[in-house]
Amino acid sequence: MGDWEFLEKLLDQVQEHSTSIGKIWLMVLFIFRILILGLAGESVWGDEQSDFICNTEQPGCTNVCYDKAFPISHVRYWVLQFLFVSTPTLFYLGHVIYLSRREEKLKQKESELRALDDKEQVEQAIAIIEKKKMKLYIQEDGTVKIKGALMCTYLTSVIFKSLFEAGFLLGQWYLYGFVMTPIYVCERVPCPHKVDCFVSRPMEKTIFIVFMLVVSLISLFLNVLELIHLVCKSMIDTLKKYSPYVPPNRYPKNEDTYPEKTSETATAPFQDKSYIYLPMNDNISYPQYKMPNEQNWANFNTEHQLAISGNNQSPLGHYSLSAFVPVPPKTHSTMEKPSTRASSSASKKQYV
């Protein structure tokens, strides 16, 4: 059982670098093959040769009939099947370990280069190392991306697993069949005539044979399904690689995000210009602030009142403030215009 535990640890490492279908295949391999075969196989098939009895007393007849009925024990046959089916996965694991060790060496070399002083040569060497690391397809979490040469190795392992499964199923059908008969008729030297041999617990052994047959069929189905998945994935990657690049659309395609255009036509000068409608909420509350010109005019009135109130105290009070008064906007009430005939006549007398 120690060798089986070592093999189980190796296959557990493969699970980290397999597809989802490959992980299901490993679960089927461990739970329904290793555990069932290790726990129930010996108890069911332990009396296979000891309880194989033939109705003859001819020496050696029972042994040759047992060898003809069971060229290889069922348990040993299933163990051999398990080893053959697991071997391609171990080759794939070896490729993964090789890529991981290679990445570790590249990282170590990169750290050594960063410690040097010549920046130009260091940058060139680091760029070369980065290109080599990209070819390894190893992600940041340590898992290997199945691409390139690793994809070929994985595809090859799946193909060989499928071939081994199908081959062992055909071999079991040719050697034993899938039903254990209670009586086996043997005619072989040194038996003097046809001999009837009896198998112990044939129904129990038939159930076990059918169970292992179903497990083998499930494993074969998963391998074929994974093979189709990998082929489709590689074809999609190839099409993406050689297809022209189409940049993503920066603007939304849904026309509902923009409000409908109003039926009213724009007035000049914006009538002939195109403009964008932006989505806005109808219930927007604006703060009650005054317009800038209204606020400036209110500030000026306040300062003007303060200046008039302090006119008597200021030494410059006898000067007129009309020179400093700005012209108010048209939207507000304007100051009274001093246009009288008396003032105009007085100005004429002054010039005379």
Swiss-Prot record:
A connexon is composed of a hexamer of connexins. One gap junction consists of a cluster of closely packed pairs of transmembrane channels, the connexons, through which materials of low MW diffuse from one cell to a neighboring cell. This is Gap junction alpha-4 protein. Residues 2-23, 100-153, 232-352 are cytoplasmic. Residues 330-352 are annotated as: Disordered. The gene is gja4. It is found in: Cell membrane; Cell junction, Gap junction. Its main location: membrane.
